């Protein structure tokens, strides 16, 4: 009889330990309201923006990150090939690098605009996003802010292209290419192209952080994040 009691006690204590572990991992799970959910998602997004976008603004943040590196548009790929074919590889390399430098510079100045867009999320949006897919928050931001961000981002990119000398480098490249016999003249809008790619890179890196916080418990660095994302763990 004593043996049976001891076995039951062991199981009971084991169960209590597991419950305590869950309680520590998911504190106050039952106390969440819409305001908590919205606050948690906004915290997660702001963390993602701060962490991932800061990587993009560093030197070579775009240029040496294969996930977001800005390559030449289709119209200019033939320019790149032609220049390399006549011994101007260094000029072609510089042309690619300055496009990425412009994006790195532009993202640094545009980030506060992007962060402010997070504040517009409603309670209903937050709850739907929380229980959605691994990139629901990023998709929501893309759909609700891209147009506004683009209109703000584009002039920053234009200024940045001028600041890093990309406009002059590419004016020189295009002039040399257009002077090659039997080629069709090109005149691409690099401002729009770099803006598109810079925004694409920002959203891609935010999506990386969103997936991480949804799937990696150690990425939930506050009690609020632990509580909020514990809900989606159980869906």
Question: Where is each model-derived feature located?
Answer:
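N-terminal Sec/ER secretory leader and immediately downstream segment
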Residues: 22-98
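Bacterial signal peptide processing site
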Residues: 17-20
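Mid-length scaffold segments of soluble, non-membrane domains
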Residues: 90-160
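Sec-dependent signal peptide recognition
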Residues: 2-7
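An amphipathic alpha-helical core segment
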Residues: 156-199
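A cross-kingdom marker for long, charged
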Residues: 198-235
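C-terminal motif of bacterial Sec signal peptides marking the signal peptidase cleavage site
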Residues: 12-15
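Residue-level signature of catalytic and energy-coupling elements of molecular machines
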Residues: 52, 122, 217
């Amino acid at each position: 009889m004593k043996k049976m009691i001891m076995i039951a006690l062991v199981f009971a204590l084991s169960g209590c330990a597991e419950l305590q572990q869950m309680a520590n991992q998911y504190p106050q799970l039952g106390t969440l309201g819409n305001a908590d959910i919205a606050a948690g998602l906004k915290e997660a997004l702001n963390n993602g923006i701060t962490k991932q976008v800061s990587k993009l603004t560093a030197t070579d943040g775009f240029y040496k990150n294969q996930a977001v590196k800005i390559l030449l548009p289709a119209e200019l790929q033939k320019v790149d090939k032609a220049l390399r074919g006549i011994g101007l590889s260094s000029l072609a390399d510089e042309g690619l690098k300055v496009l990425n430098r412009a994006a790195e510079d532009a993202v640094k100045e545009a980030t506060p605009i992007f962060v402010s867009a997070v504040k517009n999320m409603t309670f209903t949006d937050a709850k739907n996003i929380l229980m959605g897919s691994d990139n629901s928050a990023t998709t929501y931001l893309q759909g609700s802010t891209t147009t506004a961000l683009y209109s703000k981002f584009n002039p920053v990119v234009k200024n940045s292209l001028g600041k890093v000398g990309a406009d002059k480098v590419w004016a020189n490249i295009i002039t040399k290419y257009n002077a090659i016999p039997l080629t069709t003249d090109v005149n691409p809008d690099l401002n729009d192209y770099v803006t598109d790619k810079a925004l694409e890179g920002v959203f891609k890196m935010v999506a990386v952080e969103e997936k991480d916080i949804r799937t990696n418990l150690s990425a939930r660095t506050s009690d609020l994040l632990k509580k909020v994302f514990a809900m989606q763990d159980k869906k």
